[in-house]
Amino acid sequence: MSLAHVLLTSLIEKPSTGIDLARRFDRSMGFFWNATHQQIYRELSGMQQKNWISTLEEHDSTSRKKTYQVEQLGRTELADWMVKQSPPAQLREELMVRLRAEAQLGGNTVLPELERHLILHKENLKIYQTIFAKDFAN
C-alpha cells in the first residue's frame, strides 16, 4: 500500500483541499497510515501528474486553494490495487520484546504498561466501531 492509495480513498469519500485532506487524514486514515502534511502535498502533486486526480475550479479567483477530486484513472488505479495481494505487515512491537525480557528477568514490571496498552486499544476499538457504524450503516 502506498500513501497514494490512502489519499485516493479519502478523496473518493469527499473532494478536498490539501489542508482539509490532511486534517481529515489525522482523524481517520491516520489510525492506519502515518504521513506528514508535507508528504501528503508531495503525493498529491505526483498523483496529479499521473492524472489520477485533478483540481476543481475555484469560484474566487484570488484563492490559491486547490480542491482535489479523483479522476477515472485514479479510480482504475484504486480498483486495480484493491484486488492485489499484499504481504502481512512486519510487526515491530517494543512491548512484546519487553514481555520476552521480563520472562527472563522476572519482576512483573511490565504489567502496568500492558494494562495501559489495553486501555488505549479499547479506546481505538471504540473509534473503529464508530467509523464502521458510519461507513457500513446498511
Tell me the role of every PLM-derived stretch.
Residues 3, 25-28, 102-113, 138:
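Short amphipathic alpha-helical segments at helix-loop
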Residues 129-138:
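Acidic interhelical loop/turn segments
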Residues 48, 75, 122-129:
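Structural signal for well-ordered, non-membrane alpha-helices
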Residues 1-90:
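Basic helix-turn-helix/winged-helix DNA-binding cores
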Residues 22, 44, 114-115, 129:
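A generic alpha-helix structural signal
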Residues 79-125:
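Amphipathic alpha-helical dimerization/coiled-coil segments
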Residues 14-15, 33, 103, 107, ...:
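Flexible interhelical turns and helix-capping residues at alpha-helix boundaries
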